[in-house]
Amino acid sequence: MTQPLAFITGASSGIGQALALRFHQAGYRLALVARRTAEVKSWAEANGISASSYEIYSADVAITDSIVAAGKDCLARQGLPDVVIANAGISVGMDTADRDDLDVMARTFATNNIGMAATFHPFVPGMTERKSGTLVGIGSVAGIRGLPGHGAYCASKAAVISYCESLRGEMRPFGVRVVTLSPGYIDTPLTRQNRYSMPFLMQPQDFADQAFQAIDKADSYRVIPWQMGVVAKLLRALPN
């Protein structure tokens, strides 16, 4: 029996690496996408992942043709994935009064939103024909309540949640599942730049364990950790 295959973007650090390790531990072959491919190879070797159980694809998720080409390359080299995780994303603060920050917003949406759709794109025809598969979008609790100074990131993650809701309805008749995961604060190189308190901070592998459960159960939507879901809902209820 062929081992299942997981296609994961943003695999060079943080959540992406933690998810890759968790899926490897569950017996999946890996298709790992990153710009820094040498780092992915070193990480795989350090974690004892055999070269025969993974492939690395160089791509920039912000460039549509680049990530689409990586997906098509995966289809040719490893076949149709069972799980596709659109994890790659960026978070940059912005000031609407600053002209240059309009470009920051465009780059954020190109990566976090168009990049997600482009990640899924090559695999949708095969999954709908096969009538199975799981598409996973990584959102954020920041998509539930906007944070001052982070308009681009918060808006992009709110769009992720809505996009995955739409896609879920489109894919359901074909037996393809769409899972939205909204992390709270995870200890990654990205969040270590934050200069404010991060309640319920999780280690990446703890997040990956809970994320794997949610994906395996085909949850439509899950906030991880659940406490941040409560916090986000309370904040959402407050006057803006």
Locations of regions flagged by a protein language model:
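Conserved glycine-rich cofactor-binding loop
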Residues: 12-13
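Conserved glycine-rich Rossmann-like NAD(P)H-binding loop of the short-chain dehydrogenase/reductase
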Residues: 26-43
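Rossmann-fold cofactor-recognition segment
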Residues: 47-65
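Conserved mid-core segment of classical short-chain dehydrogenase/reductases
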Residues: 91-106, 149
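Active-site helix of classical SDR
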Residues: 120, 156
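Residue(s) in the substrate-gating loop at a strand-loop-helix junction
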Residues: 140
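C-terminal helical subdomain
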Residues: 180, 196-232
